[in-house]
Amino acid sequence: MKIIKADNYQTWYIEYNDQSILIDPWLSNSLTPDGTFFIQRKKINKSCLSKEDIDKVKALIITAPFEDHLHIDTIKKLPNDLPIYTSSVVSKALIKNSINNPRIILTEEGTDICSINVKALPTSYPYFSTTFSILMRDSNGNRVFHEGHRVNFRYLSKENIKSDVAILTAEESKLFGFVELGMNYKKTIKACELMGSKKLFITGNKPNNTKGFIGNFIKTKGFNTERLSKNIEVFSNEGDIYKFNGE
């Protein structure tokens, strides 16, 4: 597998055997139209992906029904025959927005996507009813775990979930100052240690860059890069790439 942090926020590109999956793609400069009241975020580059990369995309995974994960405009600009792997909650939102791509519900049992076995695992409060974590495993046994908000430590421990690479939040964000939306770096380290992950990609960078009405109620705190880097190789920048041996 090859992993690319496809933008400076939380779009992910997973390639294997010359086919690829896009996770939570947002491929425009503005998250919502100018003047949008509730939420807004902007970025200089739409993504770092080339046309060749995009042409390899054979499937989408949408992990949450929120606008910064489920970006309708991006999906509408991609081929409408791309299958979308997601939850029942997101599937309903896709139908509501007249997205006619094939829709497949991911489960803990696992589904093969682009020769990668993909499982949807439980996440943590307050997201457990609307989002899911992803565990990917290729035919060589390489594993990647993705969680865009908060990991479910109890589940990871009980099920002995292991992963070579983790894609996690590390910059604390709290709604109203106490409802945790994104993990702080200490919890990120704990998750990596629990799963045995030696490589870490940061997702959801700089939550303080999310503006609009919701931004007034979210308090954020940056992460300690040096502390993270002691025992874990950290990838946090747009365009960062990791390839497993033999890829």
What do the PLM-derived regions correspond to, one by one?
Residues Q19-I61, D73, V151-E159:
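Pre-active-site segment of Zn-dependent metallo-hydrolases
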Residues M1-I44, G215, G239-D240, G246:
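Zn-dependent metallo-beta-lactamase
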Residues I23-D24, V57-D68, Y85-S88, V144-R150, ...:
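Active-site neighborhood of phospho(di)ester-bond hydrolases with catalytic His/Asp-centered motifs
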Residues T86-G141, I232-E247:
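Metallo-beta-lactamase
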Residues A6-N17, D112-V165, E180-K187:
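Catalytic core of the metallo-beta-lactamase
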Residues T32, N45-T111:
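Active-site HxH/HxHxD metal-binding segment of metal-dependent hydrolases
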Residues N8-Q10, S28-S30, P65-L70, S91-L94, ...:
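Active-site environment of divalent metal-dependent phosphoester hydrolases
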Residues V89, F153-F244:
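Cap/insert and terminal regions of metallo-dependent hydrolase folds
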